[in-house]
């Protein structure tokens, strides 16, 4: 169906979001058109504000509005343990369970040769640099339990094995092929408890 240009652009914009197909994009566009103008302006300002004012922590790579992030700045956290995750949303998922008290390292992706993503395309060099600090004694690999996540975990474990740093992988209480961000706190807690040494 042919829509006026402003609606078409709005629909196209919504379709750029993950999981939003044409039908959902049309529903969202018409929902926004039915909203009060001040609510739409607040929504637009929130989007722009988030884009302009959020950055990645220079230490761990987590999304933040201050650098270093609040997790890296927290002196109560155990600096001897680093949990390696794929995305900032995985840090949020881990933090929800309130059981992990170490540091994080966000890779911003996973090794995926089919997509042309190699080890140098994600934050593995930054991880290796962080591990030169004698304080780190354990690395928990909490990449997603799918092919890319497993390949990334195996690659990192092979790199770190000679260092003598204790390596563990979160247990597969998480569904294979699933994403960490969608797991509930109990599942994440059990997966963390059941991690295994590599």
UniProtKB/Swiss-Prot annotation:
It comes from the Bacteria. One of its GO terms (biological process) is double-strand break repair. Keywords: DNA damage, DNA recombination, DNA repair, Metal-binding, Zinc, Zinc-finger. A zinc finger (C4-type) spans 57-72. Gene3D superfamilies: 3.30.60.80, 3.40.1360.10, 6.10.250.240, RecR Domain 1 (1.10.8.420). Residues 80-175 form the Toprim domain. One of its GO terms (molecular function) is DNA binding. It holds the Pfam family RecR_ZnF. InterPro entries: DNA_Rcmb_RecR, Rcmb_RecR, Rcmb_RecR_Znf, TOPRIM_dom, TOPRIM_RecR. May play a role in DNA repair. It seems to be involved in an RecBC-independent recombinational process of DNA repair. It may act with RecF and RecO. Belongs to the RecR family. This is Recombination protein RecR. It comes from Bacillus subtilis (strain 168). The lineage of its organism: Bacteria, Bacillati, Bacillota, Bacilli, Bacillales. The gene is recR.
């Amino acid at each position: 169906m042919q829509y006026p240009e402003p609606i078409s652009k709005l629909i196209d914009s919504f379709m750029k979001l993950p999981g939003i197909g044409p039908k959902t994009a049309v529903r969202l566009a018409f929902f926004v058109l039915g909203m009060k103008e001040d609510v739409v302006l607040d929504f637009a300002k929130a989007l722009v504000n988030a884009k302009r004012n959020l950055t990645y922590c220079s230490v761990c790579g987590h999304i933040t509005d201050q650098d270093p992030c609040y997790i890296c700045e927290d002196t109560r956290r155990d600096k001897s343990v680093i949990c390696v995750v794929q995305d900032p949303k995985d840090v949020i998922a881990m933090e929800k369970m309130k059981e992990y008290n170490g540091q994080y390292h966000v890779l911003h992706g996973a090794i995926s040769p089919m997509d042309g993503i190699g080890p140098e395309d994600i934050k593995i060099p930054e991880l290796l640099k962080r591990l030169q600090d004698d304080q780190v004694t354990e690395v928990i690999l909490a990449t997603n339990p799918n092919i890319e996540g497993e390949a990334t975990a195996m690659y990192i474990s092979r790199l770190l094995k000679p260092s003598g740093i204790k390596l563990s992988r979160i247990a597969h209480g998480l569904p294979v092929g699933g994403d960490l961000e969608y797991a509930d706190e109990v599942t994440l807690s059990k997966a963390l408890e059941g991690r295994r040494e590599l």
